[in-house]
């Protein structure tokens, strides 16, 4: 995994990456990938042990380093919920404004990852980037 500081991405940059990283409909692209993230179309908990670190390349971040306290406000204009697979990927809203962006080196799938810090727990979460859902 790349440990250097990733570039800050806006919605347009994330959309370009997502469009370039969408697995094709070829038979090879439909095979299960060793990353095992293809099913994470909504936010999914993932332990450090399950995170496919060797396959993932950090390609950017949605976390603005100038914002010390990004908003916890969510954006659901169509009435979706946080955990819905069709919820918009609104880069300036929670939880996306706390995400790093990764690409799988095996299948080219683009995923978002952030850590939820609860009162008594730490929960790493991941979601596949669907280009059709990316918004500002």
Write out the residue ranges for each language-model feature:
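Flexible low-complexity loop/turn motifs enriched in small/helix-breaking residues
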Residues: 1-8
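Short Cys/His-rich Zn2+-coordinating modules
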Residues: 8-20, 48-51, 58, 63-67, ...
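Short metal-coordination and nucleic-acid-contact micro-motifs, chiefly zinc-binding Cys/His arrays
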Residues: 26-31, 97-100
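Short cysteine/histidine-rich metal-coordination sites, predominantly Zn2+-binding motifs
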Residues: 48-60, 118-128
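Short, compact, well-ordered microdomains
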Residues: 87-136
């Amino acid at each position: 995994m790349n440990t250097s500081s990733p570039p800050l991405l806006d919605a347009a940059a994330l959309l370009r990456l997502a469009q370039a990283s969408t697995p094709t409909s070829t038979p090879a692209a439909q095979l299960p990938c060793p990353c095992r993230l293809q099913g994470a179309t909504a936010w999914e908990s993932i332990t450090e042990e399950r995170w496919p670190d060797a396959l993932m390349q950090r390609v950017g971040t949605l976390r603005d380093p100038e914002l010390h306290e990004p908003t916890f406000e969510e954006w659901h204009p169509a009435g979706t919920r946080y955990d819905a697979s069709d919820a918009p990927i609104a880069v300036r809203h929670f939880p996306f404004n706390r995400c790093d962006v990764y690409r799988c080196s095996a299948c080219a799938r683009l995923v978002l990852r952030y850590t939820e810090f609860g009162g008594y727990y730490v929960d790493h979460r991941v979601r596949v980037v669907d280009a059709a859902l990316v918004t500002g």
